[in-house]
Amino acid sequence: MRIYFAPLEGLTDAIYRRVHHATFGGVDKYFMPFISPSTSLSFTSRQQADIAPRENAGMPAVPQILCKDAGLFLEMTKLLRDAGYAEVNLNLGCPSGTVTAKGKGAGMLKDPDALARFLDEIYSKAVLLVSLKTRCGYESIDEWPRLLDIFLCYPVHEWILHPRTYREFYGGRPHRDFFLEAAAKAPFPVVYNGDLFRVSECREMNRFDLMLGRGLAVNPALAQEAQGGEGLTLDSLLLFHDRLYREYLKWWPEHAVIGRMHGVMYYLIQALDCPAPVKRALKKSADTAAYTDAVRRVFTESAITQDIHFTPPGT
């Protein structure tokens, strides 16, 4: 079983990936948050920092492209090849409304014929290995057989399948029977992604390669423990937090660091039995002094929870 860290926009940047890789084991590949190329084929400064080989040295990292224009996709793969990458991942699964409204991400599943034309072109001309990250439909699971037939036609490097439709977003239960069908029929590796929040859930699927996202964001030792290593401890969680905090403070302005660390702690605090007043103090912290004091209280007044898992908002 290989385990991949899913790209989480606004969280798993190069600094986060490096610190996680240095602190915990068990992750075989880190997928970068998507690049959505424009006709200028230029990168933002943040994207340049994220994909720079020196920022990803010593760990297996895969760039991801969000794009509906085959020509732009192919030009971007050339730039990534020249930067030293051997693989690129095509995002056909992002369910964000702002993405799908432009016909990108999961929005590309809406028109199977156009999707097939796009895949025809990129797989006939790509200069890198191309893996896919997809869902199992757009409006309905009735679309699955047609999409399955399409994906099986191409020399896919790996197929990462989140077996929900776009409309299902992250609700309900994943259609694992669709994943099992794909894994049985595909001549290439099929990787399972979806609701893997506990060690027991990972081990239940350990016949397959897995992609973990929100579960790893809550429990950064999840992949390590699922592979037979040490589980999360308060000391290892504190070490991860402090390394991450120090690295951001080296490179980012204070307000940006506090905003990012609030995003990090949104997940990490779910691994802790933390008193409500301490959570409130953390949420209110707006500068490094207040944040540092609140985090000190988090790690002195909390314990690792018995059942570590991601809890979706509103549940």
Predicted features, each with a name:
Residues M1-T315:
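Flavin-dependent oxidoreductase catalytic cores
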